[in-house]
Amino acid sequence: MAELQKLSSRLKSVKVTRKITKAMELVAASKIRRAKESFFSNKEYFQIIQDIFDNLASKTEQIFLKKQMKFDKENNTNSILYIVINSDLGLCGAYNSSIAKEIKKEIKSKDKLFLIGKKGLLFLGKFKTQITNLDKVKEISTNYKNIKKISEKILSMFKSGDYKSIKIVYTKYVNAFTYLPTIKHALPILKSEKNINEATFSNLEFEPDPITIFQKAIPLYFSSLLYSCVLESHVSEVSSRRIAMENATKNADELGDQLKIELNTIRQSKITQEITEIVAGSETEI
């Protein structure tokens, strides 16, 4: 009897859990469409900015590319600042752990981390001494104004001369089932290795000159790049959560079916035993 009650209780818990995972799956599915719309529309915009900066870099002397910002002090460090984009919520499969694995492969003791997303503290806790914003980790936001404020703070840190370069660690969206943890170089801007389509910029004039524009427009470039990475990571996160919840729902269904079989087996066994006892009792009376 005790085993029967235990199985019934487990089956009830599985059914409740299944309702939760199914609801979360549907919520994630509804968020994916909006997240994709934001990401792909911004992707077209950022690609234009990227092409313009690639063109600017191709027309700018290499010596300037190394000194494209006015630093507060001479930059002689080899330290790299990694901006790590995680999620605020869990239950999204290997989304956060994959980012953590990627950063652990590359980070050195002299490097620093700037976290965006509360879950970063959980998965990168062993690097506490290297996290620059340990007590002020920002929640992930798909609002450009919020990302712009973060980018301004990071640019200020870069201009202090404490870092040789800045890299962004985010999740690249490939398709609905594939997301790749990626480390992208952000600053200083390097001369593009890809072939510039001169025809696209043949009628483009720079006023006053490429170097001045390059210098003034770096904040726009960096905030746009960071925003693009945040949006792409967000699409990957909600897609990963939908799949995780879909798998959890399937597992709940399978476990529920298994428990039902066990429950029915015990019930049948109990009924058979009772019938046997009744028959045996009747035969004894006869």
Swiss-Prot record:
Listed GO CC annotations: plasma membrane; proton-transporting ATP synthase complex
CDD domains the UniProt entry points to: F1-ATPase_gamma
Keywords: ATP synthesis, Cell membrane, CF(1), Hydrogen ion transport, Ion transport, Membrane, Transport
Subcellular location: Cell membrane
Biological processes annotated in GO: proton motive force-driven plasma membrane ATP synthesis
An annotated Gene Ontology molecular function: proton-transporting ATP synthase activity, rotational mechanism
Membrane topology, as annotated: Peripheral membrane protein
SUPFAM superfamilies noted in UniProt: ATP synthase (F1-ATPase), gamma subunit
InterPro entries: ATP_synth_F1_ATPase_gsu, ATP_synth_F1_gsu
Stored PANTHER family: ATP SYNTHASE GAMMA CHAIN (PTHR11693), ATP SYNTHASE SUBUNIT GAMMA, MITOCHONDRIAL (PTHR11693:SF22)
Subunit structure: F-type ATPases have 2 components, CF(1) - the catalytic core - and CF(0) - the membrane proton channel. CF(1) has five subunits: alpha(3), beta(3), gamma(1), delta(1), epsilon(1). CF(0) has three main subunits: a, b and c.
UniProt function note: Produces ATP from ADP in the presence of a proton gradient across the membrane. The gamma chain is believed to be important in regulating ATPase activity and the flow of protons through the CF(0) complex.
NCBIfam families for this protein: ATPsyn_F1gamma
Family label: Belongs to the ATPase gamma chain family.
Record's protein name: ATP synthase gamma chain
